Amino acid sequence: MRVLGIETSCDETGIAVYDDQAGLLANQLYSQVKLHADYGGVVPELASRDHVRKTVPLIQAALKEANLTAADIDGVAYTAGPGLVGALLVGATIGRALAFAWGVPAVPVHHMEGHLLAPMLEDNPPAFPFVALLVSGGHTQLISVTGIGQYQLLGESVDDAAGEAFDKTAKLLGLDYPGGPMLSKMAQQGAAGRFTFPRPMTDRPGLDFSFSGLKTFAANTIRSNGNDDQTRADIARAFEDAVVDTLAIKCKRALEQTGFKRLVMAGGVSANRTLRTKMAEMLHKRGGEVFYARPEFCTDNGAMIAYAGLVRLQSGANPELSVSVRPRWPLAELSAV
């Protein structure tokens, strides 16, 4: 079975073709980073308009890359939420229309289920059960995963997501949008221990997160210590260490609570090298294993949507006959496979 995946939930247009026998046949991605850079963040209307311009040409490019025609596609998967409503509607409308024209089923995919399943695209995919850390600009969640669609929320951020905190702190440090990856690069030049940031909510029981206070702490630290290059690098290092330590502490608790030996990291922040190293060390000490996707599949992409849609279609998911999206969509509401 070959599935065309369409991802348009935010500021990246991702198109891919996944085959249940041959694996990933095509992967096309267009990023709107330059479009939104002058505004310091994603402008929803601009994002939607750009998806309108880019989605169909990228679908054509993906089919060409895979050396396929429309007749070779057996199903269409599109991101139906969560995300920006206008951006979601572009992908959903195009996906549903193509499926109708091609006479194949269309299936709506949960964006975060796509991220959660992205490590399944690798040569060494995780087996169930596992704890999943979904960590991105919009979400920071710990999920108990016992099967496809069998998700139990263990904890989540009560304010800013980790990726959002990275971007906001990067802006305080004078870095351009999107600043998270640049903050991590700057942190590599920072001295460990010059500044010590708090590890929020680690001094109390539970698995929830809070990252908004770290941004305030960073602002106060910058104000009190100047803004020369080395100081900025040292602050970036202290901030990143605090976020990584906090995530590791909570993941360890989640593994202890569930008794699972496997941890899956997904979402844009899961590409962070410091985070990967920290989690690998923690899992090694526990006799467990950590899994994550290659960096290009940590951020938004069509491959994860194509794969998640394939799994849903093969399990007998009812094809969608209408176009509907859900800007807010709890992961726990998904049906089990």
Swiss-Prot record:
Instruction: Please share the entry's free-text remark on the cofactor.
Output: Binds 1 Fe(2+) ion per subunit.
Q: Provide one Gene Ontology biological process annotation.
A: tRNA threonylcarbamoyladenosine modification
Q: Recall the GO molecular function terms of this protein's record.
A: iron ion binding; N(6)-L-threonylcarbamoyladenine synthase activity
Query: Which EC numbers characterise this protein's activity in its record?
Result: 2.3.1.234
Instruction: Identify the domain of life.
Output: Bacteria
Where does this protein chiefly localize? cytoplasm
Species of origin:
Serratia proteamaculans (strain 568)
Which Pfam family, any one of them, does this sequence belong to?
Answer: TsaD
The UniProt keywords, alphabetically, are: Acyltransferase, Cytoplasm, Iron, Metal-binding, Transferase, tRNA processing
Q: Where in the cell is it found?
A: Cytoplasm
Annotated family = Belongs to the KAE1 / TsaD family.
Q: What does this protein do?
A: Required for the formation of a threonylcarbamoyl group on adenosine at position 37 (t(6)A37) in tRNAs that read codons beginning with adenine. Is involved in the transfer of the threonylcarbamoyl moiety of threonylcarbamoyl-AMP (TC-AMP) to the N6 group of A37, together with TsaE and TsaB. TsaD likely plays a direct catalytic role in this reaction.
Q: Which cofactor does it need?
A: Fe(2+)
Q: For substrate, which residues are the binding ones?
A: L134, V135, S136, G137, G138, D167, G180, N272
Protein name as catalogued: tRNA N6-adenosine threonylcarbamoyltransferase
> Which PANTHER family does this entry report, sorted A to Z?
TRNA N6-ADENOSINE THREONYLCARBAMOYLTRANSFERASE, TRNA N6-ADENOSINE THREONYLCARBAMOYLTRANSFERASE, MITOCHONDRIAL
Q: InterPro entries annotated for this entry?
A: ATPase_NBD, Gcp-like_dom, KAE1/TsaD, Peptidase_M22_CS, TsaD
User: So what does this thing catalyse?
Assistant: L-threonylcarbamoyladenylate + adenosine(37) in tRNA = N(6)-L-threonylcarbamoyladenosine(37) in tRNA + AMP + H(+)
Annotated residues for binding of Fe cation: H111, H115, D300
One GO cellular component, as annotated = cytoplasm
